[in-house]
Amino acid sequence: APKFTGRFNKGVDYVGDVEQFEKEFNDDLAVIKRAIAAYGLPENLKLSVHSGSDKFSIYGPISKALKETGAGIHLKTAGTTWLEELIGLAAAGGEGLQLAKDVYREALANAYALCAPYASVIDIDTAQLPSADEVDGWSSEQYQNSLRHDQSIAKFNPHVRQLLHVGYKVAARMGDRYLNLLKECEAVVAKNVTENLFERHLKRLF
């Protein structure tokens, strides 16, 4: 997991010089290829792009390099999958939407504690975070549009997305309430998770 130029903030797109990233990525692939030959390392050794999910701006250069070299890549998707679970619950409406709103309320109330361990990989403007009362009044569509990583949606809010990305502990503390709703809303949650991983990530990379 080499350190690349630019910022890899949690849950949002890459911020930096894409051309410089491409150069560094290709250089690292060359180093791995040489190391495999020189030191007998496993031939399937892969680069790990830490916090690489949702970094759509650099997927083109990564895809190009992988196709040209036959190399592999390890992309961590736990965080983006958690957010799609939350979007799926909001899409389901009813108790699912209420839980999603409750997660936001608790995350906002505990923002300092939740954000502190991730200070170097988030960039949240608190002035851009709606109040919990405002979010309580949102429709299912409003919640989804704010959170879903689609920059063509005018209401997409990267600050909300980053806060909820690091707010997974709120859902963990909910325990069975959260897990049971995931099961009850499995169809819509699975649809969102699958579309995100396959359409936005795998198809763009491979």
Region locations from a protein language model:
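Active-site capping/gating regions of soluble enzymes
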Residues: 1-206
